[in-house]
Amino acid sequence: MVVAVYPGTFDPMTRGHEDLVRRASNIFDELVVGVAHSPNKRPFFSLEERIGIAREVLGHYPNVRVEGFSGLLKDFVRKNNARVIVRGLRAVSDFEYEFQMAGMNRYLLPDVETMFLTPSDQYQFISGTFVREIAVLGGDVSKFVFPSVERWLQEKIGKAE
């Protein structure tokens, strides 16, 4: 059984993230979506909220599990007995950072591979940052996120006002 981990902050989970999950879940026996607590980032949604959102969006995939994690990715990968780390590449600008991370992960986890997936054409430009900015400014994000995510955004923005 081949287990893969797809880590990210997923702040919020977008249609692009779901696209990668759908495709990766067809490749691997089990896919663990690791929702990261990153002390270097100031997420819009709390870790618990991001886990809840991801579970709502991805709950219909029988071989996908959503878990939160903090600390080193290598420890999360080991805990889940994963053989592959899945990463998305939207643009050439993502490549340099992801290439360096893959090299470091290979050093820390020599028996684990990193697999890059590019998004489907209609999702190449979507990012959580763009979605949040559009939503905060009152724009329509329905083409970029699922209805449940849009509701989470509206509720969070409403509380902030």
From Swiss-Prot:
Residue positions binding ATP: 9-10, 17, 88-90, 98, 123-129
Keywords assigned: ATP-binding, Coenzyme A biosynthesis, Cytoplasm, Magnesium, Nucleotide-binding, Nucleotidyltransferase, Transferase
Gene Ontology terms describing biological process: coenzyme A biosynthetic process
Top-level taxon of origin: Bacteria
Keyword Ribonucleoprotein on entry: no
Catalytic activity of the protein: (R)-4'-phosphopantetheine + ATP + H(+) = 3'-dephospho-CoA + diphosphate
UniProt function note: Reversibly transfers an adenylyl group from ATP to 4'-phosphopantetheine, yielding dephospho-CoA (dPCoA) and pyrophosphate.
Subunit structure: Homohexamer.
PANTHER family on file: PHOSPHOPANTETHEINE ADENYLYLTRANSFERASE
The protein, known as: Phosphopantetheine adenylyltransferase
Organismal lineage: Bacteria, Pseudomonadati, Pseudomonadota, Betaproteobacteria, Burkholderiales
Gene: coaD
